[in-house]
Regions:
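Amphipathic alpha-helix face/heptad-repeat signature
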Residues: 17, 164-168, 194, 250-253, ...
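Structured mid-to-C-terminal alpha-helical surface segments
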Residues: 209-270
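Helical scaffold of the NTase/Pol beta-like nucleotidyltransferase catalytic core
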Residues: 1-40, 71-72, 270
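Glycine- and acidic
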Residues: 3-11, 61, 240-244
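Conserved NTP/Mg2+-binding pocket subregion across the NTase superfamily
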Residues: 2-10, 77-188, 192-195, 201
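Extended, well-ordered alpha-helical segments in internal regulatory regions
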Residues: 199-207
Length: 270
């Protein structure tokens, strides 16, 4: 596949995004060879709200069999080389390599070769959010190479989406109870991420669907009562602020928002 025949759904992307995707495709095919089944885009690229300023490039690679240590080493070298590529998105990749059997349905405790934004390839345990990732790929994933993802991933029910979201929401409640966690003092962009994530949680629980962050924000602005509507609105000015540290009032407000979402979801305050 070349830049000229990328799916039309991503043909509008900036050249530096498609350039990274082209290098990603070539490198994966070279490293994996005949074990490759398919390569799919997920996340904001799949859901149609990719933001060149803040979004990362989420991908999923499907393989016939579990990656061998030799193939893992080859992929690690490739990803290290790609990370040094003179392109702003070369460090904005998040993806995983999952074999056909494991991909069909999420099973807790499994580990797969995974790369996170700004990091290298590692063997990582996939948590319950990979129910949501599978759903996104199955229902909206963009196929770069390979069969329709619906042929590879079993249907995921609304009840399974609810269960996965509630598990993640409990994790967020635990986090909101930890005022001494240093990550609460990260720049305002982090607080925007928390607010956006809570909006997505509420959207899924209310609508039985998964949407992008921008879509969830618009929905929340039309749906949430005060003071939370105003918080959601203000948070959008924080999205690209990677410098300003939040004051304690903002941190407290965002924490209360997490607890409000949890209460609406039927989770008792912890």
């Amino acid at each position: 596949m070349t830049l000229s025949n990328f799916p039309t759904t991503i043909s509008h992307l900036p050249n530096n995004v498609t350039e990274v995707l082209q290098n990603l495709l070539y490198g994966i095919q070279e490293a994996i060879g005949e074990n490759l089944v398919g390569i799919y885009l997920r996340g904001s690229l799949a859901l149609g709200d990719f933001d060149p300023k803040t979004s990362d490039i989420d991908f999923l690679v499907v393989i016939n069999d579990t990656i061998t240590e030799e193939k893992f080493a080859n992929l690690s070298v490739f990803h290290s080389q790609l990370a040094s590529f003179p392109n702003q998105y070369a460090l904005d990749l998040e993806g995983a390599y999952i074999d056909l059997d494991a991909l069909k349905r999420y099973r807790a405790g499994e580990i797969h070769p995974t790369i996170y934004r700004g990091g290298g390839l590692q063997w990582g345990e996939h948590r319950i959010n990979w129910v949501l990732e599978r759903w996104t790929v199955r229902e909206h994933g963009i196929t770069l190479i390979g069969p329709d993802p619906k042929k590879l991933i079993e249907p995921i029910s609304v009840e399974e989406l609810y269960s996965a979201v509630l598990v993640r929401l409990r994790d967020w409640v635990d986090y909101a109870n930890q005022l001494d966690d240093p990550t609460w003092r990260l720049p305002l962009s982090h607080k925007a991420y928390v607010v956006e994530t809570m909006c997505r949680v509420m959207f899924t629980l209310d609508c039985g669907d998964i949407c992008s962050k921008p879509h969830a924000i618009l929905w929340a602005l039309e749906t949430f009562p005060e003071p939370w509507r105003s918080l959601v609105e203000r948070s959008q000015s924080w999205r690209i602020d990677n410098v300003t540290s939040p004051d304690v009032n903002i941190i407290s407000e965002v924490m209360r928002f997490v607890h409000w979402v949890a209460s609406k979801a039927g989770l008792s305050k912890q």
